[in-house]
């Protein structure tokens, strides 16, 4: 499986069919993957093969990188439609995630006020109040559900937390009172000799 890792904090912009001109944000190390899932389809590769050795960027490094890139884009006459947190794994694992979202809102409001802020998350950190507060502040809170069957979640997403399952996830999703989008990867095929069809 070919893999893709982002080598910067801010990457792009890329043209997304769904989001438009998207400026990517990677809050994770640039040399590997940090994730609470080990999805069979992950573009970043499998966790064991892509283990990060470097540290996560600091809140200050993220803020400075975003401000520099948006300033350069302004000079080039390019405006992003969205600032998208994705990157080399699960962005909500960054210990300063809530503060980084706050900083991003301030920077966005100053330099590109029409741009939305989106977070692509696997929803494993919703038990943390700080993560929920931050996700409730972004424009596009995009959370993942690949299956409602725990057996399929274990097969497709391969969560690190043995107790992670759909019932718990559903209760946590209800707390957003509709302020979310669900993202699903539909699969059909064989993985390690087992049929996968969600």
Name these PLM-found stretches:
Residues 64-86:
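Short Fe-S-cluster ligation motifs
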Residues 20-22, 39, 80, 140, ...:
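Structural motif
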Residues 27, 85-87, 184-186:
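Short glycine-centered, acidic/aromatic-flanked micro-motifs in structured strand/loop junctions
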Residues 18-61:
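Canonical Radical SAM [4Fe-4S] cluster-binding loop centered on the CxxxCxxC motif
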Residues 93-198:
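Conserved AdoMet/S-adenosylmethionine-binding subsite of the radical SAM
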Residues 1-18, 64-67, 71, 194-198:
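Auxiliary Fe-S-binding modules of radical SAM enzymes
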